[in-house]
């Protein structure tokens, strides 16, 4: 029996593959698209406010020098048939109005009657032009909020399952972000509510209040911060005053200039790479948490560590002028006077299982870096760490 082998050239094989792909595309129903656009403008004055609620799209704001809010909404629906795409388009209603000093735009989606919605999608994008100082409430679900480089009005922002990209806020700001990322510039007086935020980047801030859960924050410079963080990570390059609760988290501070109060350091780690010699106080209460502090060797201060029964208290690199160890009732209390100092004080409540480490920073000569670097930048690189000078990406867990 003779067997004939047919050898196909690469060109023939490629033609055959392309033919199969084309046949597959022909067999698959073509996607149909239906669109509509809504535009409306309203005159506004000082004291007025904009309110927007949207889903399945983005809110993009730009500023102009007119006393008018211009709202343009682009709606697009995709489906396997034109009829089905049109049905979905008709389900989406955009209501805009002005009552008193409130300009509002709300997306409403009627309930779907047919549960078979495979290969169907909708996109609802808002494009808003408004005066820079107009106050605004923006609420976006399943999409992003994009704001200009400078925002001068009071802002109330809610974004879920999406990202916030914004510049500076010169007025009060309230930001709620869940299941996304945020990146903002400078903040004056702001409150942040964060949940499952992969990366929250803040450039500079004057006064911040943050409630963070399962989120990661990166802050460059801040004057005053009140914060509760659970199950996350915090990196701050420079801060003056901190009042915190840290639970099941890791926190790193580059430079602490003035005061720190941690009411609960629970199952967490807090590291301060450069405590200013002019600091006023450091108070930390630990519940299975660890504190590490570094400051210049010639700083005059005191260390008080209490209830350290099963804990470690490590102090090194300083001129210890007085040390007292009290093991009455087996609580193990430590007191150190560094360079003759009685104030200010690093006070650490170990609650038996928290660990404290206080060490002297290395001098510029010991660090061995190039002398051409500026002193302030040089010290930051030595003591704050390179990780604080570079962006860090985190993955949502």
Region spans (language model):
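Intrinsically disordered, low-complexity terminal regions
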Residues: 1-385, 391-397
